[in-house]
Amino acid sequence: MTPHRTPRSRRTVALSAGLATAAAFAFLPGTASATSADVLGAKDAASAVTEAAGTPLSYVVNVRPGKGNSAKVKKAVGRAGGTIVQAYDQIGVIVVHSSNDAFAKTMRGVKGVQSAGATRTAPLPAQSTKDVGTPKALTGAQAEAASAAAVAGEDPLQPLQWDLPAIKADKAHEKTLGSRKVTVAVLDTGVDDTHPDLAPNFDREASVNCVTGKPDTADGAWRPSAEESPHGTHVAGEIAAAKNGVGVTGVAPGVKVSGIKVSTTAGFFYTESVVCGFVWAAEHGVDVTNNSYYTDPWMFNCKDDPDQKALVDAIVRASRYAERKGAVNVAAAGNSNYDLAADSIHDTTSPNDTTPVPRDVDPGECLDAPTQLPGVVTVASTGAKGLKSSFSNYGHGVIDIAAPGGDSTAYQKPAPPATSGLILGPVPGGKWGYMAGTSMASPHVAGVAALIKSTHPKASAQRIKSLLASQADAVPCTDPYDINGDGKVDAVCEGGKNYNGFYGVGIADALDAVTKKK
């Protein structure tokens, strides 16, 4: 069996220095390199895995709309050697396990099936792998200095949070902290709801474990284990860490946050888990979902590949369902410094659950899910100086909005008393640590969306997205963009001040979110 690659699907980047638990991140635009497998085509690599006799895989089968189709397709699943794990009849997606190597091909020939495909190239269950890195832990000296600098009304670590004033969240909090009737769901690696910065605002009823593609509602199933990444806990804190005299403050510290665990222990975000997560959010009153990941094993899912097309079809159905139910879906743009509007991108990481096979893809035809899906708010990252982060993906017509996600202090140094260009947030075990990535930018926008929902409780998801865009602070292109000062252009921005490929409509504005009625 081919060994698993270290999963890189979370939208964080690894740091050279790290402490504490598992997963914080650096400023290297491309982290994966080509392998000896580049003599094969990508499709050949995938089929080489699935054609092994009796390989157990997970699949999604997408049913065509039409009376009676669901029942017929379910019967066909059994005849094709599949076992139904979960049927999401509300969106026509069926999660299946099968050891029949021809299962997907057989199902694609069944009347009433729109698409069907394997959600992974690795056999069930996925092998365990180590995480990418560790958070850069907050030191005792930093905490003491921050606490001494805190003014009345601030949480003790808030002076280190340069990201809050960058979106005017500190000013917004003088008006309101957000509504307890608003919930943001974090689809991620799990959330430690016992953390003192998260416990006051945690919504247990809207939390679940979706890793298998079927909701696990056992108490605490949404939490990460000790071996798993703190990523989801950090993201949740950026959104809604309570303003309670402890630790940090979230963008919307008065709203609720839930944990929807969609990542395996090995760190993979598979389609069945993501579909389950969106459907759960849709049916449990969630107002905003945050998605700081890409769906494994393909960084880009190509429409001309029947398996990859099926994965996109399933996630589109689920995310649109969540939006129809009132949720605004926010997603991280990614950390490869890719131009997502380019004619071609060289993908060296896919499939990431077996042996990657380098390939050239057209990002207009091969989609990063959920980042590039219709209706999703796609977020680019900025650093402490308000410039595009060195790692952040970009692209005219792809990026919707920008927010702080951090960057190396060598590139963008914050003003004192903040000392790190990264984003500070909670990590499991009652600790706090620094992380960076578009993973950190996305929850800032999710938090602002939650503040807008708090101000406009009857607003539809579409209306909230419209306000998010109209209230953003426009930022012109950074031209030339030479973030490391070596005299070479590191990325090219297209567009004008009011919209461009680096910052979209601009940087999210939390103060406008709570003060503007239109």
What are these regions (language model features)?
Residues 153-254, 276, 283-310, 335-350, ...:
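Active-site core segment of subtilase-fold serine proteases
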Residues 4, 37, 74-158:
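Autoinhibitory propeptides
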Residues 353-451, 508-515:
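Extracellular S/T/G-rich loop segment that most often corresponds to the catalytic His/Ser-adjacent loop
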Residues 1-36:
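Secretory targeting and sorting signals
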Residues 262-369, 373, 426-444, 500:
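Substrate-binding/access-modulating region of protease and related hydrolase catalytic domains
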Residues 40-51, 78, 130-186, 214-228, ...:
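N-terminal domain-start motif of subtilase-like serine proteases
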Residues 53-63:
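Short glycine-/aliphatic-rich beta-strand segments at the starts of folded cytosolic domains
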Residues 37-52, 85, 286-293, 456-518:
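C-terminal subdomain of the subtilisin-like protease fold in secreted/lumenal serine endopeptidases
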